[in-house]
């Protein structure tokens, strides 16, 4: 079983330089790992068994299995209630009149592993875009400043390069920050879109699936219909048509066991709650981002919290001189640079910025 999940190990690698935030990582790391693991779990027939087993008189089992796998199986919604073994064979499996009674086909069954993998790709797209747009800028600026044991000569040289870059490119980082904000918005749009996509995939059953499962546990046994048995039945029906000896069409009703649905029902209960939590956190993250863009005072407080070792006057001066793009880059640097070195960077930036301010005041008199 552990060999099956070997391909997921690469996603567990911790990046040396952080270019995003925790909510962002929940999308492209946690969610992608979860979806790929689920996809591999469903795909691993050798560990779980045959995906479908059908029985019907006079039809070879292999033929029936293949036919029902291709054309999908169905249940009868009117037969979801009743005593198993007396009124119905299993919930949703009972006698019906073809063409009159409503039947529900479960066409999703053979596509679950592919859809889960496709969802994992979609969750990685914003990360891929941001990594391409970011272009390794933070990594180049951090260099070895994330190590507390770097020697003084090397530290001073690289710190000077960083400060010179920042002063020389002041007010030129808005587009850099804007592209990250776009990727954050894409994360939110993606997770909301995924909820609707899975709802469409499961024929409108996903949007209320988790809440229905919770309600099911609170109802009396004789009053409840198991939503997991409705959406992911373990036993279904399959109708096979063939020509008889006289050339007439014969109809054969078969029972099919869908063993993977015992896994699928748990997977989608988990995904329902995970997507809800992820969408709420992503929404809060967007509100936070809007507040950061619109509030210079909030940016000052956040930078102060990030550089607690620096003097408050120096932090205030730097925050006031930075626009949103400069602030964002400086804040991201604070996540990756050693706190003591970051304090010195803030101090050097403050000194350079105050020096530029004094020079600007002196120029009219010098002229």
Curated annotation (Swiss-Prot):
TM spans (from-to): 23-43, 110-130, 180-200, 267-287
GO molecular function, one term: gap junction channel activity
Main subcellular localisation: membrane
Any GO BP annotation: germarium-derived egg chamber formation
UniProt topological domain (Cytoplasmic) ranges: 1-22, 131-179, 288-367
Phenotypic consequence of gene deletion: Female sterility. Only one third of the zygotic mutant embryos survive up to the first instar larval stage. These mutant larvae display a feeding defect most probably caused by a keyhole formation defect during proventriculus development. The feeding defect may result in larvae death by starvation. Zygotic mutant embryos display large holes in the head region and a variable spectrum of segment defects. In maternal and zygotic mutant embryos, epithelial tissues and organs are severely affected, the cuticle fails to form and extensive cell death occurs.
Compartment annotation: Cell membrane; Cell junction, Gap junction; Cytoplasm; Apical cell membrane
Inducers of expression: Expression in embryos at ectoderm/endoderm boundaries during gut organogenesis is induced by activation of the wg signaling cascade.
Record's bilayer topology term: Multi-pass membrane protein
Keywords for the protein's UniProt record, in alphabetical order: Cell junction, Cell membrane, Cytoplasm, Developmental protein, Differentiation, Gap junction, Ion channel, Ion transport, Membrane, Oogenesis, Transmembrane, Transmembrane helix, Transport
Claim: Ion transport is one of the keywords in the record: yes
Membrane topology (Extracellular): 44-109, 201-266
Interaction with shg: region residues: 130-179
GO cellular component terms, semicolon-separated: apical plasma membrane; apicolateral plasma membrane; basolateral plasma membrane; cytoplasm; gap junction; lateral plasma membrane; membrane; plasma membrane
Tissue expression per record: In ovary, expressed in inner germarial sheath cells, prefollicular cells, follicle cells, nurse cells and oocytes. Expressed in embryonic epithelial cells. Expressed in foregut and hindgut from stage 11-17, segmentally repeated tracheal placodes at stage 14, salivary gland at stage 16 and proventriculus at stage 16-17 (at protein level). During germband extension stage (stage 7), expressed in epidermal epithelial cells. Expressed in cephalic furrow. Repeating epidermal pattern emerges at stage 11, refines to one or two cells at each side of the segment borders by stage 13.
Oligomer status and interactors: Monomer and heterooligomer with ogre or Inx3 (via cytoplasmic C-terminal region). Interacts (via cytoplasmic loop) with shg (via cytoplasmic region). Interacts with arm.
Physiological role: Structural components of the gap junctions. Involved in gap junctional communication between germline and somatic cells which is essential for normal oogenesis. In embryonic epidermis, required for epithelial morphogenesis. Required for keyhole formation during early stages of proventriculus development in response to wg signaling. In follicle cells, promotes the formation of egg chambers in part through regulation of shg and baz at the boundary between germ cells and follicle cells. In inner germarial sheath cells, required for survival of early germ cells and for cyst formation.
Family: Belongs to the pannexin family.
Protein name (record): Innexin inx2
Organism name: Drosophila melanogaster (Fruit fly)
């Amino acid at each position: 079983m552990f060999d099956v999940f070997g391909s997921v190990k690469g996603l567990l690698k911790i990046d040396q330089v952080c270019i995003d935030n925790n909510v962002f990582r929940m999308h492209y790391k946690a969610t992608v790992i979860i979806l790929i693991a689920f996809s591999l779990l469903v795909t691993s027939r050798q560990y779980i068994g045959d995906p479908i087993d059908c029985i019907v008189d006079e039809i070879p089992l292999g033929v029936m299995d293949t036919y029902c796998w291709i054309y999908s199986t169905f249940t009868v919604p009117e037969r979801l209630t009743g005593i198993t073994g007396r009124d119905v064979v299993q919930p949703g499996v009972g006698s019906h009149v073809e063409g009159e009674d409503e039947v529900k086909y479960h066409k999703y069954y053979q596509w679950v592993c592919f859809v889960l993998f496709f969802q994992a790709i979609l969750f990685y797209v914003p990360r891929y875009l941001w990594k391409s747009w970011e272009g390794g800028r933070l990594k180049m600026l951090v260099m070895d400043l994330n190590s507390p044991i770097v020697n003084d000569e090397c530290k001073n040289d690289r710190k000077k390069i960083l400060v010179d870059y920042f002063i020389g490119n002041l007010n030129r980082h808005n587009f850099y920050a804007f592209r990250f904000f776009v990727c954050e918005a894409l994360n939110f749009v993606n997770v909301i879109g995924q909820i609707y996509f899975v709802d469409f995939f499961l024929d409108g059953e996903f949007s209320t699936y988790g809440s229905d499962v919770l309600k099911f546990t609170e109802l009396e046994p004789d009053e409840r219909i198991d939503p997991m048995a409705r959406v992911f039945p373990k036993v279904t029906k399959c109708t096979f048509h063939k020509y008889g000896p006289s050339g007439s069409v014969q109809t054969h009703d078969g029972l099919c066991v869908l063993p993977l649905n015992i896994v699928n029902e748990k997977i989608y209960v988990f995904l329902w709650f995970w997507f809800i939590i992820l969408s709420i956190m992503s929404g809060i993250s967007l509100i936070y981002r809007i507040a950061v863009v619109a509030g210079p005072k909030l940016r000052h407080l956040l930078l102060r919290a990030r550089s607690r070792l620096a003097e408050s006057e120096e932090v205030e001066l730097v925050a006031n001189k930075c626009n949103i793009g400069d602030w964002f880059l400086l804040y991201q640097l604070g996540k990756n640079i050693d706190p003591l070195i970051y304090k010195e960077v803030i101090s050097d930036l403050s000194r350079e910025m105050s020096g530029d301010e004094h020079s600007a005041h002196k120029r009219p008199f010098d002229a």
